[in-house]
């Protein structure tokens, strides 16, 4: 399929126009970020943990294989770098803007959803015992038999945030969006059967899976936490991508909806201008007496008659 190219739509020429049209969306993005910060500050629900429940919570307390600060780099900054590279190849600010806005919504909606569930559920992590009792000596309330933690407050707080996995949900939110994006750009569903295209699309998904596995290996999450996080990330990423872009197998799957809407509006504007110009020309010919010039309609009719 030949791509429709009507001049360059660069950041310099159309960037402010596109951003201004979506100013409300960017403000919502900021609000989502603030909400997620609040959700990370508030205290999660402290689920009851009795002596007989510690069996599955006494795994070693290891450091993260992939620290939390690295997750936004992997799932947001790396995809944005790919979006920018594609922008310099095609010079389409519509694609760049909607890709960045889309992955931002994907990750922040996922973050708010994940952290809301974390705070509400309050599931203890597999390494909760050593978060709660750093010296290895458990202590329980004499009446309720609930744990009485004597560890670092911040570490204990994080110990109640096992379900679902934030690393996993964020990774799938960003990298699934990237997989959708690559599918549309390289036309992975062009029915030519090139396996290399599938490998490229599956690579971000594989990275997300490995990040999720690392959370189980580090004893920071149960496998069900990782599974739930993956479902949330994939679900939100898919909806976010399809909100801004067509399906990758669509004929126009290589560009955002806004790009084709802009082309349609431009074509409509040109057609309206040509119609008005033609109408003024026809009126001028009718007013001038003795003008032998024929109208566009007459010329079209004469041209048609001459063909026969």
UniProtKB/Swiss-Prot annotation:
It holds the Pfam family PAP2. Keywords: Hydrolase, Membrane, Transmembrane, Transmembrane helix. SMART domains: acidPPc. One of its GO terms (biological process) is phospholipid metabolic process. Its main location: membrane. Its EC number is 3.1.3.-. Belongs to the PA-phosphatase related phosphoesterase family. This is Probable lipid phosphate phosphatase 4. The gene is LPP4.
